[in-house]
């Protein structure tokens, strides 16, 4: 029987492939209830997409703050080779502190996770000063000198820097103007003759003025009156526009794209912001109430780097893996389960179905690379559920249940995107019903 020509063929083929994949490929032994005794530590070690907070390397630390760099995404696995050009840095500082002027050899996407900041970008014709609040983001081009101030008297500042490397893939290097115990000023590497000619001054004066070691580190205490003077010229991020070419923008500038009583997702895509378009990156902010479930879904193009900012989450990610048995190459389904706590990072590859449950009130941020023209396809819920778009005639041949039974099953869930994480339909044995679910979807149980 013919079905509507308006139904997109690519969507039909993709969903049919997902639903029927277990008929062609072996399941990895993570069916419902199995491997429940596997320890969290063991699961983390076997999960190449999970990066615990202890995977950050400390680049600098003193009594005023710290700068940490996450290990390379592809350091322990070839599965994340597509992320070799990207690095994640975390900057934390105490109140009334300054990160000294420097420039990076990589493009940076700066995102404020906690607190407030004064960011000053220096250019040949002057400087731009911005006040950044929680949720603000801005792109800093490679080679741009900048410095950061925590102007608050009480609250710490925490910033996530997402680096896009290009000079040496996967390597981020910062060049500081000042001389510290850790590293001298890069100006000191020039010869005396070059410096004297450049500044038209004797070397002793240049050394005393610019090169002598003065600071214990690159994060220093700053007097309040000096902070107030710099703050007078600071511009705040605009919550009315997302398309500024060079000014900060806020993740919650617009209404959430998904929202109900269980959670919200704010998202800015490359199509809506020129800074993100230059980097081919999307940004989102996920907020969920304790016990809520972000239903199974997948991204068509974007690989999302999910950062746990506040709270705890239980995440299940489904992927396909190559396997060789008796000289024959086959594929198998694999469920990667993890509990994320503050500071942990999970990589969600494109096309990998994922579901997430809030173990407490939850706040997470996501950075999606290769994000242009990305689509998020839901596998459950009332709205934007791609399975609901499959006509009954095709469902008859796709699922164990009839097309009518599939439609009835999908009608049970009245909510969309975020739902109650506790199943309502429980059998006599205390287990959630999962009749007529193909193996792909049983991996989420």
Curated annotation (Swiss-Prot):
GO MF annotations in UniProt: nutrient reservoir activity
Limits of the Cupin type-1 domain: 49-207, 249-407
Record keywords, A-Z: Seed storage protein, Signal, Storage protein
UniProt key word Transcription regulation: no
CDD domains xref list: cupin_7S_vicilin-like_C (cd02245), cupin_7S_vicilin-like_N (cd02244)
The keyword Signal belongs to this UniProt entry's keyword annotation: yes
Top-level division of the source organism's lineage: Eukaryota
Name this protein carries in UniProt: Canavalin
Signal peptide: 1-26
Taxonomic path: Eukaryota, Viridiplantae, Streptophyta, Embryophyta, Tracheophyta
Physiological role: Seed storage protein.
Organism of derivation: Canavalia gladiata (Sword bean)
Subunit structure comment from the entry: Homotrimer.
Family in the record: Belongs to the 7S seed storage protein family.
């Amino acid at each position: 029987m013919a079905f509507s020509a308006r139904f997109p063929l690519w969507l039909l083929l993709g969903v049919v492939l997902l639903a029927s994949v277990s008929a062609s490929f072996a399941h990895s032994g993570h069916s419902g209830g199995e491997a429940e005794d596997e320890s969290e530590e063991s699961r983390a070690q076997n999960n190449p997409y999970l990066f615990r907070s202890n995977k950050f390397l400390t680049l600098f630390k003193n009594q005023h703050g710290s700068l940490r760099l996450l290990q390379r995404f592809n350091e322990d696995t070839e599965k994340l080779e597509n992320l070799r050009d990207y690095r994640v840095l975390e900057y934390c500082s105490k109140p009334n502190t300054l990160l000294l002027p420097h420039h990076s050899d990589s493009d940076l996407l700066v995102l404020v996770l906690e607190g407030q900041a004064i960011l000053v970008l220096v250019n040949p014709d002057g400087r731009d000063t911005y006040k950044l609040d929680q949720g603000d983001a801005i792109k800093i081009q490679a080679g741009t000198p900048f410095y950061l101030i925590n102007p608050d008297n009480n609250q710490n500042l925490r910033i996530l820097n997402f680096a896009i490397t290009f000079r040496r893939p996967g390597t981020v290097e910062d060049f500081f103007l000042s001389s510290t115990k850790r590293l001298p000023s890069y100006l000191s590497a020039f010869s005396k003759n070059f410096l004297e000619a450049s500044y038209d001054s004797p070397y002793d004066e240049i050394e005393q003025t610019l090169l002598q070691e003065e600071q214990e580190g690159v994060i220093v205490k700053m007097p309040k009156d000096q902070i107030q003077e710099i703050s007078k010229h600071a511009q705040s991020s605009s919550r009315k526009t997302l398309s500024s070419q060079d000014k900060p923008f806020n993740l919650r500038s617009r209404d959430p794209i998904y929202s109900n009583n269980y959670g919200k997702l704010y998202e800015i895509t490359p199509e809506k912001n020129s800074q993100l378009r230059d980097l081919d990156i999307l940004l989102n902010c996920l907020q969920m109430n304790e016990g809520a479930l972000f239903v199974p879904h997948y991204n068509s193009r974007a690989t999302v780097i999910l950062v746990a900012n506040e709270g705890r989450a239980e995440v299940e990610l489904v992927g396909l893996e190559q396997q060789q048995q008796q000289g024959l190459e086959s594929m198998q389904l694999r469920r990667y389960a993890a509990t994320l706590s503050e500071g942990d990072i999970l990589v969600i590859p494109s096309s990998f179905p994922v579901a997430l449950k809030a173990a407490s009130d939850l706040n997470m941020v996501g950075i999606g690379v290769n994000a242009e023209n990305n689509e998020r396809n839901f596998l459950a819920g009332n709205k934007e559920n791609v399975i609901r778009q499959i006509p009954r005639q095709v469902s008859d041949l796709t699922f164990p249940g009839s097309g009518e039974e599939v439609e009835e099953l999908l009608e049970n869930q009245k909510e969309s995107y975020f739902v109650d994480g506790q199943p309502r339909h429980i059998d006599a044995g205390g287990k959630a019903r999962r009749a007529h679910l193909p193996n792909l979807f049983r991996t989420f149980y």
